[in-house]
């Protein structure tokens, strides 16, 4: 979580396993694309930096954050990936829609992690304002996509222990 004391893009480089032989899926919501595209770029750049081949990064765009659960399951089952990163952004509005979407995608991704054998990483920003999202998509709090990619590499490495 980004706070005044922690930047999402700060991590111990040496603690991240090499991704040379890994295949990573990335499910990306198109909604709030001005946020999700920089998140995706942060994830891809980090994966490449840690040895994942560009050919082994499979990106699937979906209309919105709610669809990330389905896309993540699809990537895990159809593309034989070692981990999936779900990237989305939900900003609170004037209706309860925010709560329904956040709860649905959180429960969906949790269920995929319980039922499946491919780790699905929660790279979804749930913010009160667009400014908060921007600050976590490459702004002053770093990039949640970078954090999600590091988590994916570490979780994919669990299978190799």
Curated annotation (Swiss-Prot):
Keyword annotations of the record: Riboflavin biosynthesis, Transferase
Annotated (2S)-2-hydroxy-3-oxobutyl phosphate binding sites: 94-95, 136
MF-aspect GO terms: 6,7-dimethyl-8-ribityllumazine synthase activity
Top-level lineage group: Bacteria
Presence of the UniProt keyword Transferase in the record: yes
Family annotation (CDD domains): Lumazine_synthase-I
GO biological process: riboflavin biosynthetic process
Active site: 97
Catalytic activity annotation: (2S)-2-hydroxy-3-oxobutyl phosphate + 5-amino-6-(D-ribitylamino)uracil = 6,7-dimethyl-8-(1-D-ribityl)lumazine + phosphate + 2 H2O + H(+)
GO CC, alphabetical: cytosol; riboflavin synthase complex
Membrane-crossing segments per the record: none
InterPro entries: LS (IPR034964), LS/RS (IPR002180), LS/RS_sf (IPR036467)
Residues given in the record as 5-amino-6-(D-ribitylamino)uracil binding sites: 31, 65-67, 89-91, 122
Coiled-coil intervals: none
Record pathway: Cofactor biosynthesis; riboflavin biosynthesis; riboflavin from 2-hydroxy-3-oxobutyl phosphate and 5-amino-6-(D-ribitylamino)uracil: step 1/2
Keyword Nucleotide-binding: no
EC number: 2.5.1.78
Family per record: Belongs to the DMRL synthase family.
HAMAP family reported for this sequence: Lumazine_synth
Job of this protein: Catalyzes the formation of 6,7-dimethyl-8-ribityllumazine by condensation of 5-amino-6-(D-ribitylamino)uracil with 3,4-dihydroxy-2-butanone 4-phosphate. This is the penultimate step in the biosynthesis of riboflavin.
NCBIfam families found in the cross-reference section: lumazine-synth (TIGR00114)
Protein name per its UniProtKB record: 6,7-dimethyl-8-ribityllumazine synthase
Organism: Porphyromonas gingivalis (strain ATCC BAA-308 / W83)
